[in-house]
Protein backbone atom coordinates (compact mmCIF):
# COMPACT_ATOMS: atom_id res chain seq x y z
CA UNK A 1 0.00 0.00 0.00
CA UNK A 2 1.36 3.42 -0.97
CA UNK A 3 -0.28 6.82 -0.48
CA UNK A 4 0.93 10.18 -1.84
CA UNK A 5 -0.65 13.60 -1.38
CA UNK A 6 0.51 16.90 -2.91
CA UNK A 7 -1.70 20.00 -2.90
CA UNK A 8 -5.01 18.68 -4.24
CA UNK A 9 -3.30 15.76 -6.03
CA UNK A 10 -3.43 12.45 -4.24
CA UNK A 11 -2.75 8.88 -5.21
CA UNK A 12 -2.68 5.48 -3.60
CA UNK A 13 -2.25 1.92 -4.73
CA UNK A 14 -2.31 -1.64 -3.49
CA UNK A 15 -1.05 -4.97 -4.76
CA UNK A 16 -2.37 -8.43 -3.98
CA UNK A 17 -0.27 -11.43 -4.93
CA UNK A 18 -0.73 -15.09 -4.15
CA UNK A 19 2.16 -17.54 -4.52
CA UNK A 20 1.08 -21.17 -4.79
CA UNK A 21 3.45 -24.11 -5.09
CA UNK A 22 1.17 -26.78 -6.54
CA UNK A 23 3.90 -29.45 -6.75
CA UNK A 24 7.69 -29.65 -6.85
CA UNK A 25 7.50 -28.76 -10.56
CA UNK A 26 4.52 -26.36 -10.73
CA UNK A 27 4.36 -22.83 -9.28
CA UNK A 28 1.38 -20.45 -9.81
CA UNK A 29 1.34 -16.67 -9.07
CA UNK A 30 -1.82 -14.63 -9.70
CA UNK A 31 -1.60 -10.92 -8.83
CA UNK A 32 -3.78 -7.80 -8.91
CA UNK A 33 -2.41 -4.25 -8.80
CA UNK A 34 -4.66 -1.20 -8.49
CA UNK A 35 -3.53 2.45 -8.63
CA UNK A 36 -5.74 5.52 -8.15
CA UNK A 37 -4.65 9.09 -8.96
CA UNK A 38 -6.96 12.05 -8.39
CA UNK A 39 -6.31 15.60 -9.60
CA UNK A 40 -2.94 14.71 -11.12
CA UNK A 41 -1.45 17.15 -13.60
CA UNK A 42 -0.02 16.05 -16.92
CA UNK A 43 0.41 16.81 -20.60
CA UNK A 44 -2.96 16.38 -22.33
CA UNK A 45 -2.91 14.39 -25.58
CA UNK A 46 -6.15 14.54 -27.58
CA UNK A 47 -7.30 11.15 -28.89
CA UNK A 48 -10.16 12.74 -30.81
CA UNK A 49 -10.56 16.12 -32.49
CA UNK A 50 -11.55 18.83 -29.98
CA UNK A 51 -14.14 21.34 -31.23
CA UNK A 52 -12.22 24.24 -29.67
CA UNK A 53 -8.59 24.45 -30.61
CA UNK A 54 -5.75 26.14 -28.82
CA UNK A 55 -2.21 26.93 -29.93
CA UNK A 56 -1.02 26.61 -26.33
CA UNK A 57 0.65 23.58 -24.81
CA UNK A 58 -2.25 21.99 -22.94
CA UNK A 59 -1.93 20.33 -19.55
CA UNK A 60 -4.87 18.69 -17.84
CA UNK A 61 -6.08 18.01 -14.34
CA UNK A 62 -7.18 14.40 -14.46
CA UNK A 63 -8.22 11.33 -12.55
CA UNK A 64 -6.46 8.10 -13.48
CA UNK A 65 -7.38 4.55 -12.53
CA UNK A 66 -4.92 1.79 -13.46
CA UNK A 67 -5.49 -1.94 -13.01
CA UNK A 68 -3.10 -4.80 -13.78
CA UNK A 69 -4.12 -8.45 -13.61
CA UNK A 70 -1.28 -10.97 -14.00
CA UNK A 71 -1.16 -14.75 -14.01
CA UNK A 72 2.17 -16.56 -13.93
CA UNK A 73 2.87 -20.27 -14.22
CA UNK A 74 6.32 -21.82 -13.82
CA UNK A 75 6.95 -25.45 -14.71
CA UNK A 76 10.31 -26.98 -13.86
CA UNK A 77 11.01 -29.96 -16.11
CA UNK A 78 14.45 -30.71 -14.62
CA UNK A 79 16.96 -28.64 -12.68
CA UNK A 80 18.27 -27.49 -16.10
CA UNK A 81 15.01 -27.11 -18.08
CA UNK A 82 12.05 -24.90 -17.32
CA UNK A 83 8.99 -23.22 -18.84
CA UNK A 84 7.45 -19.93 -17.70
CA UNK A 85 4.05 -18.68 -18.90
CA UNK A 86 2.85 -15.13 -18.13
CA UNK A 87 -0.51 -13.58 -18.94
CA UNK A 88 -1.10 -9.88 -18.21
CA UNK A 89 -3.90 -7.37 -18.71
CA UNK A 90 -3.07 -3.70 -18.15
CA UNK A 91 -5.92 -1.17 -18.12
CA UNK A 92 -5.51 2.59 -17.62
CA UNK A 93 -8.48 4.98 -17.64
CA UNK A 94 -7.93 8.75 -17.68
CA UNK A 95 -10.78 11.27 -17.16
CA UNK A 96 -10.00 14.98 -17.43
CA UNK A 97 -11.52 17.49 -15.00
CA UNK A 98 -10.21 20.75 -16.54
CA UNK A 99 -7.36 22.09 -18.66
CA UNK A 100 -4.44 24.49 -18.25
CA UNK A 101 -2.02 26.15 -20.63
CA UNK A 102 1.71 26.03 -20.01
CA UNK A 103 3.14 29.53 -19.69
CA UNK A 104 6.71 30.45 -20.72
CA UNK A 105 7.51 30.81 -17.00
CA UNK A 106 6.73 27.12 -16.52
CA UNK A 107 3.57 27.80 -14.53
CA UNK A 108 0.10 26.58 -15.47
CA UNK A 109 -2.79 28.95 -16.23
CA UNK A 110 -6.30 27.49 -15.96
CA UNK A 111 -8.35 27.60 -19.19
CA UNK A 112 -11.93 27.96 -17.94
CA UNK A 113 -13.31 28.47 -21.47
CA UNK A 114 -11.63 25.34 -22.89
CA UNK A 115 -13.73 22.18 -22.40
CA UNK A 116 -11.80 19.66 -24.52
CA UNK A 117 -15.04 18.31 -26.01
CA UNK A 118 -15.45 17.26 -29.63
CA UNK A 119 -18.35 18.24 -31.92
CA UNK A 120 -20.58 15.52 -30.42
CA UNK A 121 -20.01 16.70 -26.83
CA UNK A 122 -17.70 13.80 -25.89
CA UNK A 123 -14.28 14.46 -24.35
CA UNK A 124 -11.51 14.32 -26.96
CA UNK A 125 -9.00 13.64 -24.16
CA UNK A 126 -10.56 10.93 -21.95
CA UNK A 127 -8.85 7.64 -22.66
CA UNK A 128 -9.27 3.94 -21.85
CA UNK A 129 -6.03 2.11 -22.79
CA UNK A 130 -5.67 -1.68 -22.67
CA UNK A 131 -2.74 -4.02 -23.23
CA UNK A 132 -3.17 -7.79 -23.09
CA UNK A 133 0.10 -9.70 -23.28
CA UNK A 134 1.10 -13.36 -23.34
CA UNK A 135 4.71 -14.46 -22.78
CA UNK A 136 6.18 -17.96 -22.93
CA UNK A 137 9.81 -18.64 -21.95
CA UNK A 138 11.79 -21.84 -22.34
CA UNK A 139 15.08 -21.93 -20.41
CA UNK A 140 17.81 -24.54 -20.84
CA UNK A 141 21.01 -24.41 -18.78
CA UNK A 142 23.31 -26.62 -20.89
CA UNK A 143 26.56 -25.84 -19.01
CA UNK A 144 27.19 -24.00 -15.74
CA UNK A 145 26.94 -20.30 -16.61
CA UNK A 146 25.63 -21.02 -20.12
CA UNK A 147 21.98 -21.04 -21.01
CA UNK A 148 19.66 -20.88 -23.97
CA UNK A 149 16.37 -18.97 -23.75
CA UNK A 150 13.61 -19.26 -26.32
CA UNK A 151 10.92 -16.61 -25.94
CA UNK A 152 7.50 -16.23 -27.60
CA UNK A 153 5.43 -13.08 -27.01
CA UNK A 154 2.08 -11.88 -28.28
CA UNK A 155 0.03 -8.79 -27.47
CA UNK A 156 -3.22 -6.98 -28.17
CA UNK A 157 -3.63 -3.24 -27.65
CA UNK A 158 -6.91 -1.32 -27.67
CA UNK A 159 -7.83 2.26 -26.96
CA UNK A 160 -11.19 4.03 -26.70
CA UNK A 161 -12.94 6.76 -24.72
CA UNK A 162 -15.21 4.50 -22.61
CA UNK A 163 -13.69 5.38 -19.23
CA UNK A 164 -16.81 4.42 -17.25
CA UNK A 165 -16.94 0.77 -18.40
CA UNK A 166 -16.38 -1.81 -15.63
CA UNK A 167 -13.09 -3.73 -15.67
CA UNK A 168 -14.50 -7.05 -16.92
CA UNK A 169 -16.35 -5.32 -19.81
CA UNK A 170 -13.11 -3.58 -20.78
CA UNK A 171 -11.22 -6.90 -20.72
CA UNK A 172 -13.94 -8.55 -22.83
CA UNK A 173 -13.83 -5.71 -25.38
CA UNK A 174 -10.04 -6.03 -25.59
CA UNK A 175 -10.20 -9.76 -26.29
CA UNK A 176 -12.99 -9.50 -28.90
Show which residues each predicted segment covers:
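Exposed, low-structure sequence patches enriched in small/polar residues
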Residues: 1-176
